[in-house]
Amino acid sequence: MRQTKTGILLANLGTPDAPTPEAVKRYLKQFLSDRRVVDTPRLLWWPLLRGVILPLRSPRVAKLYQSIWMDGGSPLMVYSREQQQALAARLPDTPVALGMSYGSPSLESAVDELLASDVDHIVVLPLYPQYSCSTVGAVWDELGRILARKRRIPGISFIRDYADDGAYIDALAKSARESFARHGEPDVLLLSYHGIPQRYADEGDDYPQRCRDTTRELVSALGLPPEKVMMTFQSRFGREPWLTPYTDETLKMLGEKGTGHIQVMCPGFAADCLETLEEIAEQNREIFLEAGGKKYAYIPALNATPEHIDMMLKLTAPYR
């Protein structure tokens, strides 16, 4: 009897191919066309997206990408490739592919790569620690569409999320402690998660609870008094209410209150990207300091640290 051959698919959001208005426009068009991301009726959304949002936002977002672009590409792609390579090095007999919901390499190219390696079973690990319909749900949807076009469908194990997994919490705690050792213990540790529309949560998305689960476990692991830790939500888009409190407004408030030393961690981002390196490390730093704060440090994402790769090994082990 033939032994089952398993492959691993690491999934993340995606990134433009270049820091140019044209590349950003292509990426944003695909991203903002997904109903999991924006569920506004299409007759209303298409004219707004194509006639207003893409022409106005693409040049502006391209400039932001230019400020963080690395020699090997966008930070998200550089760190995601490092994660893939590090995990593959630890699992020499297991093919590991990288796929993005939007842009390239696509999820379909990752599935094709694994099938070409003759795998019978794919472990899908979306690198979103806290489930949301707009992230993990989008991976699930696209995976279904991809497999619907295949004659040979492999077995699939799909890891929904890992918000309170012990190895994940340990990796976050180690990263925070290293930052405290480097910068001193902050007056407030602010945990900033990507926001979603409040309506999504009202309709059943358990993302807010999964963020609270991560926060609770991390506070316990660090042994910090609860009053020294705050949980906020960033990157809101559009006019409808999103999860609160908002990161930028909270940092402004803390600066105005005279809070001297803030450190910010983004536990929901498995790899540094525009939302962490530009929005949090730069824009929100300015907000805090201009409001009266004294010291601000961003704690990097887990990226390809050994502890993060250990976590991936642990999460996928039951299915390999």
Swiss-Prot record:
Q: Which GO terms describe its molecular function?
A: ferrochelatase activity; metal ion binding
Catalytic activity from the UniProt record: heme b + 2 H(+) = protoporphyrin IX + Fe(2+)
The cross-references to Gene3D superfamilies, in alphabetical order and at most eight, read: 3.40.50.1400
What are the transmembrane regions? none
* Location within or outside the cell: Cytoplasm
Q: Which domain of life is it from?
A: Bacteria
Alphabetic keyword roster: Cytoplasm, Heme biosynthesis, Iron, Lyase, Metal-binding, Porphyrin biosynthesis
User: What does UniProt give as GO cellular component?
Assistant: cytoplasm
Entry EC no(s): 4.98.1.1
* Pathway linked to the protein: Porphyrin-containing compound metabolism; protoheme biosynthesis; protoheme from protoporphyrin-IX: step 1/1
> Where does this protein hold Fe cation?
H194, E275
Task: Show the PROSITE patterns listed in the entry.
Answer: FERROCHELATASE
Q: Name one Pfam family in it.
A: Ferrochelatase
Q: What is its main location?
A: cytoplasm
Q: Which GO terms describe its biological process?
A: heme biosynthetic process
NCBIfam families for this protein: hemH
* Subunit-structure text: Monomer.
- Tell me, what does this protein do in biology? Catalyzes the ferrous insertion into protoporphyrin IX.
Q: To which protein family does this belong?
A: Belongs to the ferrochelatase family.
Task: Provide the protein name.
Answer: Ferrochelatase
